[in-house]
């Protein structure tokens, strides 16, 4: 891209590093940023820096929060006896959109993936086991994606949690195999939650 100024090239390269953003999309985003007023551009930059500095993990469920407990763990209206295990925080947002689930969550921050060198020790599994071992959990719903890594993670966790006498269920397959929760529509997620099964 020798025809662009160096600062613009750098901006395009940074946008292209984001997942799902190719070269042309990165260029469009970079040119849009250049069309912003100085105040708008500064507000955009500040929002990125602030999110990076302030967003942390909830000490209970490992969901994203801007300090202390996440709103779901802090809510007395949520059923604390049921935990829905998801791969990442985007899956929490997808399930919350269904308005069907009233329990709490546990965010693993990934799935077991030997091909990507991600093992159980790289995930938030120890904190999940500690929550279940505390003895006040009745059911753990495995809501990892229905792909190879998601299935492997769900089966691994089911074997790990079974000795605690907790009911371990899996979302029903209203979600297509190889699909991702964040792209599922609300009705599909509702059916998947209603049709979960024990594993």
Short names for language-model regions:
Residues 26, 75-144:
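Extended interfacial segments that mediate partner engagement and assembly in macromolecular machines
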Residues 3, 36, 40, 116-120, ...:
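Catalytic cores of large soluble enzymes that bind and process phosphate-bearing ligands
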Residues 9-16, 27, 33-36, 63-64, ...:
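S-adenosyl-L-methionine-dependent methyltransferase catalytic core, i.e., the SAM/SAH-binding region
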Residues 129-141, 145-199:
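Long C-terminal interaction/binding lobes of large macromolecular proteins
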Residues 2-8, 17, 30-92:
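Cys/His-rich Zn2+-binding cysteine-cluster or related metal-binding knuckle/ribbon modules and their
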Residues 16, 34, 49, 66, ...:
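Signal for well-folded cores of large energy- and translation-related assemblies
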């Amino acid at each position: 891209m020798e025809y662009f100024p160096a600062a613009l090239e750098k901006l395009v390269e940074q946008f292209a590093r984001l997942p799902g953003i190719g070269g042309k999309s990165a260029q469009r985003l970079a040119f849009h940023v250049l069309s912003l007023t100085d105040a708008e551009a500064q507000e955009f930059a500040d929002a990125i820096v602030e999110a990076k500095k302030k967003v942390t993990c909830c000490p209970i469920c490992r969901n994203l929060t801007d300090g202390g407990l996440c709103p779901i763990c802090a809510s007395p209206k949520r059923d604390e006896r049921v935990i829905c295990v998801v791969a990442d925080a985007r899956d929490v947002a997808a399930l919350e959109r269904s308005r069907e689930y009233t329990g709490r969550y546990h965010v693993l921050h990934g799935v077991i993936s030997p091909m990507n060198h991600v093992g159980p020790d790289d995930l938030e599994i120890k904190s999940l086991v500690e929550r279940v071992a505390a003895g006040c959990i009745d059911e753990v719903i495995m809501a990892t994606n229905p792909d190879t890594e998601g299935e492997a993670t769900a089966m691994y966790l089911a074997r790990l949690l079974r000795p605690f006498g907790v009911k371990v269920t899996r979302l029903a397959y209203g979600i297509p195999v190889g699909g991702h929760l964040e792209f599922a529509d609300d009705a599909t997620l509702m059916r998947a939650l209603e049709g979960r099964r024990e594993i």
